[in-house]
Amino acid sequence: MAIMSDKWIKEAVINHSMIRPFAEKQVRVHNKEKIISYGLSSYGYDARVSNEFKIFTNINSTTVDPKNFSEYNLVDREVDVCIIPPNSFALGRTIEYFKIPRDVLVICVGKSTYARCGIIVNVTPLEPEWEGHVTLEFSNTTPLPAKIYANEGACQFLFLKSDQICDTSYADRQGKYMKQVGVTLPLT
């Protein structure tokens, strides 16, 4: 597998609508204010987080169970700045909608701006022929409240192209998160 360049990413967007909307250069300023960057980079794409968040809460005294997940574990917010409580967790989603080619696997890494503040972003790999908004998991590892800025960069996606096309893609096996829109909770 090889990591793909900005040139390849642009071509995949033009020919296959791989990322929508797409910023073909790094955006660092919006309305004359500095923001956390997003857009195309040398070997990846920095995606933005939308203003939809689900923040973990303990007000209902429930247990987090990935096999039987309860929405009572979360508080929904549509905000420009999401405040994650100390040592807590929030879900968001990318503004961008992704359509992954059959011979590509995508991995996500966090942005150093957030990592240096103790905020970790986690996403499982985007598999061949998966498509949808990416649900982002934000962990606040600090003992203080932490901010996530909607409509700004949140993570970077790296595109790995295989020398062989897979026998079975995510679409072929009808993966449960196929074509997800919005923040998607755990499914079993």
UniProtKB/Swiss-Prot annotation:
GO MF, one term, reads:
dCTP deaminase activity
Instruction: Provide the binding site for dCTP.
Output: 111-116, 135-137, 156, 170, 179-180
Task: Report the InterPro entries cross-referenced here.
Answer: dCTP_deaminase, dUTPase-like_sf, dUTPase_trimeric
- Please give the pathway this protein is involved in: Pyrimidine metabolism; dUMP biosynthesis; dUMP from dCTP (dUTP route): step 1/2
Recorded hits in SUPFAM superfamilies, A to Z, give: dUTPase-like
NCBIfam families in the record: dCTP_deam (TIGR02274)
PANTHER family cross-referenced by the UniProt entry: DCTP DEAMINASE (PTHR42680:SF3)
Kindly state the subunit structure of this protein.
Homotrimer.
Its function? Catalyzes the deamination of dCTP to dUTP.
Q: What is the protein name stated in its UniProt record?
A: dCTP deaminase
Origin species, per record, is Rickettsia rickettsii (strain Sheila Smith)
